[in-house]
Structure formats: C-alpha cells, structure tokens
Amino acid sequence: MRRKPEILAPAGDMEKLQMAVLYGADAVYLAGTSFGMRSFAGNFTPEELPKAVRFAHEHGVRVHVTVNTMPRNDEVAHLPEYLERLGGAGVDALILADLGAFTLAGKYAPKCERHISTQQSIANYECARAWYDLGAKRVVLAREVSLQEIREMRAKIPEELELETFCHGAMCVSYSGRCLLSNYMTGRDSNRGQCAQPCRYQYALMEEKRPGEYFPVFEDEKGTYIMNSRDMCMIDHLDDIMDAGIDCIKIEGRAKSAYYAAIVTGAYRHVLDDIAAGREADPVWRDEVEHVSHRHYSTGFYYGQPGQYYDNSRYIRDWQVCAVVTACDEDGNATLSLRNKFAAGDEIELVGPDCRPFTMTAPVMRDAEGFELLEPRTPQMIFKMKLPQRVPPMSFVRHAVSLSAKD
C-alpha cells in the first residue's frame, strides 16, 4: 500500500534538534545520557530532555529516544528509573534492541511506543510479526533488506505494525552493531555506542617473515579503504519508498553537524512533499544533499546486492558554513553568528527553513558596535549584514570551498 512516510531526523544535541525540527522533520531521534549507542554525540541530560521534548511538541514533532545498547547485568538495575524518567518527560517512542529492556519499557514507560532498533537486524516478516506479538509498534529494518523484500513484508505483517528504514547516511560494513573490529582493535564496544570505525582506517600489508616491513596498498592516492562503505542516499527514489509501504524514513547522523541535520532534513522534506503531491521534485532541493560533507552516494541494498565500488572512497567536502542567522527583519537586516571566516566581496549562498537557496556577494559587514567589518574572524562573533530579503532564523550562510583533497 502506497503511503507517505514520516521523516525521522537525527538530533545529537539541542542545536541539532532545533535545526531538524525547523527544517521539516516529522520526528527526531535522540539519546539520553545512557543506553544510547552514540557515546560521542552530544546527547541530552535529564535537565535538557524535557526542554527538547517541549520544543519538538510545540512544533508538532514527535521525539523518539534510543535505548538500544545491550546492557550488562550491572546496568539493568538502572533501567527502570531511566525509563520512568523518559516516560515522564513526554517522550513519544523508545527505540529498543534488548528483549529485557523492551519488556521493562512496557512496564515502566507504558505510554511510550516501543520501536525495535536496527540493531536487531530484522530482515523477514516472521521476525517482524514476532516483535509485533510481543507489543512492538514499529520495527526498524536492517539496512541489508531490499525494496522487494520490504514489499513482501508489508503484505505479510499486520497493518498496524509500522516499518521504518534508513534512507540516508553512513552504512556499517557489518550488520549494524554486530561488528567486533572496534572491540578487538581498540577495546571500544560498538554495541555500547563507542565504535572506533576501524573500517575507515587506512591499512598496509605485512609479510610474516618480514616483521615491521610494511607494504602499502593503493586504491587511490590516499591509500586503501577495503571495508569503507559508501553513504546511502535514497532521495532520488522516494517514489519506490512510498510504493513499498514504508511508514518512516530515517536519516542517519546523530554525531554529525547541526548543518548536516538541517540541510539533509530540509532536502528530504521538500522532495518528499513534491513527490507525494504528484509534482516533479524541485532539483534545487534535491541538490542540497550534495552541499553537506559525505562519501560518494549509493542506494545501499535497496535494489539488491550492489557489488563493490573501487573508484573512490574519499569524503566530499565542497561547502563550508560561514555563519548562522540569529535574527533578520523584513528589510533583510540580519544578525549573524560566525562559524568560519569569509570576507566582503566573497560569493556566498544562503539557505534556511523553507527558504530556497540563493547566491549573493557578501557586502561590507558591521560589528556589534556598528563599525565596518570587511572580514569577521573570531568564532561565534556576532555581526550584522544586509541581505536582499528577509530569511528565517537558523538560516545558513555558506560558500564553496575545496576541502575534499585534504581528507
């Protein structure tokens, strides 16, 4: 059954949550200070979480909290209190992987929907039905499942059971969370949110009779990336996503920047709305996914086994954020906060919530005291700039750069 999926965006901290909400997310997913699979995202303290939920709900956006680590014996005793706190904060759904945590969530956070994490690698309809029978509202499917398999699953599971899939972002070389490379090589547990991503390392060969003598392996001028997955991007295939009966598309990236959360969410929002309304997708919004740092894109496993890509595995970083708009009046008099330096006379681009990207030449700016400023330099510096039109707060000023070669 064709349906328009909700867009679930990453919110690694309060700024990222605000960006995702304002740029068009239907729901955001985040973590508290425990059990959340992303130790290096900002995450939310007990004091911050109710504020985050309140902000999201004021904008009609749902909040999903990850509780998807595999807790050990000494951690389980802390789960009931933690789950009660999440329920009390008004969280809409919990993303769970451990069966014990799933059961406790039903008892201590009964008002929260229970969603099954991709950590469970659900890849067939019998597994999905089993979780539904236990009380799950939604299952997050393994990234390795094809669209054809999803269509079959949709036809063989209860209509009330929702299907969520990843549509954009980094992919794991292993089944999600089931890789032991990080544990073995660095002592950091991927099932506890601490993956060191050794699949992204550069490797060399060593012959056993020549210890200490390393032989480089070359894929390109940077070395080799034997296990380095490309990024997923399904923005050109949202029609197929809708036809498969998927209820929610998820953007990976809680540990990525607020700019990433905003731009990717906004791109999918506009393209999905166009497709759902029967319009041709606006290429300007589709192109926004090229304006964030990313590896070369692929469609993952959605269209079957994709084979291997050997031509390039480097990061693409062709755009840099210069500033964030904090206020702007009807005449285009804007107040901004500096992120990276730029100068009067530079060609810059602005994009914001429901603000179509446009290009302009940076004018002479003014500092907080009103003095002319040719080149703001201090990070987080507040300055003024005249724009040709009003733009919403949380809009970005960016410019084209060439950082890819430095990766």
Ranges and model annotations:
Residues M1-L22, A27-L30, S34, H59-T69, ...:
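Surface-exposed amphipathic alpha-helical tracts and adjacent flexible/coil segments at the periphery
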Residues D13-K16, S34-Y125:
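Active-site beta->alpha loop and helix N-cap motifs at the rims of alpha/beta catalytic domains
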